Amino acid sequence: MSVKHTNACGTGTGASPLEAYERAWACDPTSAFGGILAFNEKVDAATARKVTGQFVEAVIAPGFAVEALKVLGKKANLRVMNMDTTGIHKASGFDVRRVMGGLLAQQWDLHRLERDR
């Protein structure tokens, strides 16, 4: 997923993190430029090489291959964050947004996506 200023710019699924990234970026590359990339699986070296060809501020994922960290580490001013997803599907809570005159609240959507569906 690509995000900029808290707005989703694109999402994608694929057989690999690279394929998912390419589909997400293709949704709206102009808006994704300078944003944040979020992955729901470990980032491999091929994905890292592709990511460093774009201008992004940060990459967050539940893990990075050693070679991917080496590749990403060479990109100036790129923030790389490892996200611990242990127990995330057992969490509960609400996403709250302010709107003029009130609040919007909805329960977190923590359903797992399956590749074959």
Language-model segments: what does each one mean?
Residues 1-117:
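ATP-dependent carboxylate/acyl-activation modules
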